From Swiss-Prot:
The record marks 101, 160, 165 as: Interaction with host rpoB. The keyword Electron transport does not apply. Zn(2+) binds at residues 118, 121, 144, 147. Residues 171-192 bind DNA. The lineage of its organism: Viruses, Duplodnaviria, Heunggongvirae, Uroviricota, Caudoviricetes. It comes from Salmonella phage P22 (Bacteriophage P22). The gene is 23. This is Antitermination protein Q. SUPFAM superfamilies: DnaJ/Hsp40 cysteine-rich domain. Mediates the switch from middle to viral late gene expression by associating with host RNA polymerase (RNAP) so that the latter can read without pausing and through transcription terminators preceding late genes. Competes with host factor sigma 70 for binding to RPOB, the beta-subunit of host RNAP. To join the elongation complex, binds a specific DNA Q-binding element (QBE) and interacts with RNAP that is paused during early elongation. Participates in the lysis-lysogeny decision by activating the expression of the late lytic genes. A zinc finger (unnamed) spans 118-147. GO terms for biological process: DNA-templated transcription termination; transcription antitermination. The record marks 134 as: Interaction with host RNA polymerase sigma factor RPOD. Belongs to the phage antitermination Q type 2 family. It holds the Pfam family Antiterm.
Length: 207
């Protein structure tokens, strides 16, 4: 069972869950099986499970839990980022909260997010390669140049920067780009890593 099935489980079309064809109905996962598997996955990959469930609007509580996990991670690695490491006390905590909140919002973004779908590829991640299409006389596609193949626009890092300047008024754009934004980017990546970990664990416990 993969993580995608967790979202389906919360509004199932049938009482049995399965990602692939099974030999018999008894080979499918019952609701009890799924809940038990989710519990095991949450105990081993709480961050990833909370991140995924929050992203799919399964629980507002999971959203906040995911941001809290992300803040803990940010605090742990903040020493690597000069623009954050030098901050003290309450200011640092607030900056980490802002970074975690914006990073989680970026992780949650998809082509289904209102207003986020790429205008060029309409969410497919693919666009017509005009030059090659004319050269070969048939439609040739390429990775969409606007969205880089993801099908949607990311949360602008500039929005996080503006929010941070409310806490650090003298933070310039160049300093942000060099010393703070790398942490923001790392937080987005960490969300995807934690989801992957949770997905692997859930798959392992349901084999």
């Amino acid at each position: 069972m993969r993580l995608e099935s967790v979202a389906k489980f919360h509004s199932p079309k049938s009482p049995m869950m399965s990602d692939s064809p099974r030999a018999t109905a008894s080979d499918s996962l019952s609701g009890t099986d799924v809940m038990a598997a989710m519990g095991m996955a949450q105990s081993q990959a709480g961050f990833g499970m909370a991140a995924f469930c929050g992203k799919h609007e399964l629980s507002q509580n999971d959203k906040q839990k995911a941001i809290n996990y992300l803040m803990q991670f940010a605090h742990k690695v903040s020493g690597k980022y000069p623009g954050v490491a030098k901050l003290e006390g309450n200011t640092k905590a607030k900056v980490l909260q802002v970074l975690a909140t914006f990073a989680y919002a970026d992780y949650c973004r998809s082509a289904a997010t209102p207003g986020a779908r790429c205008r060029d590829c309409h969410g497919t991640g693919r666009a017509v390669d005009i030059a090659k299409t004319e050269q070969w006389g048939r439609v040739v596609e390429k990775v969409c140049g606007r969205c880089k193949g993801v099908g949607y626009s990311k949360v602008p890092a500039s929005a996080a920067y503006r929010a941070i300047t409310m806490l650090i008024p003298n933070l310039t754009q160049p300093t942000w780009s060099r010393t703070v934004k790398p942490l923001y980017d790392a937080l987005v990546v960490q969300c995807h890593k934690e989801e992957s970990i949770a997905d692997n664990i859930l798959n392992a416990v349901t084999r």
